[in-house]
Amino acid sequence: MKNLHWQCNQFQQLDNHQLYELMKLRVDIFIVEQKCPYPELDDKDRQVETRHLTAYRDSSLIAYARLLPPGLSYPDPSIGRFAVESSVRNQGIGSLLMEKSLEEIDKLWPDHAIRISAQEHLKEYYEKFGFIKVSDIYLEDGIPHVEMLK
């Protein structure tokens, strides 16, 4: 997709505007849209090895993923807080975000499996990228999830 500008930054590299935008997108999706009242901010965001992958169209943040190093959430690197702004969904941006996330993780932590906690209804979506289900369904913040590995 043309006209997208990608950045992959550590927390310390984000300016105030970028930080506000990505936190707003996460809150809008994970707390407001999904009606899931949980602490969105955690210390994982500020860890030196954590990366914040963002996609901008013009000057607007439209997609975001948080890339976590091995040992922070799982023994393997992981992708989380995967978010696409509602006005640009179903245009292939989520697929581009996943492809870019996988590329960045491969650069940062080569030769590692990648583990995610996926909402159960999105299992087939993640299977398209090579993830396989490795757990039974469990509830995370009241939403059915499965652990998946690539």
Please describe what each predicted stretch is:
Residues 2-52, 56-60:
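Short amphipathic alpha-helix that is part of the acyltransferase structural core
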Residues 42-47, 71, 139-140:
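A short beta-turn/loop motif at secondary-structure boundaries
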Residues 54, 60-69, 78, 83:
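Conserved beta-strand in the GNAT
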Residues 70-79, 89, 108-112, 142-144:
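A conserved beta-turn-beta hairpin within the catalytic core of GNAT-like acetyltransferases
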Residues 84, 90-103:
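Conserved acetyl-CoA-binding loop-helix of GNAT-fold acetyltransferases
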Residues 98, 105-118:
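Conserved GNAT acetyl-CoA-binding A-motif
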Residues 115-117, 127, 132-147:
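Conserved catalytic-core motifs of GNAT/GCN5-like acyltransferases
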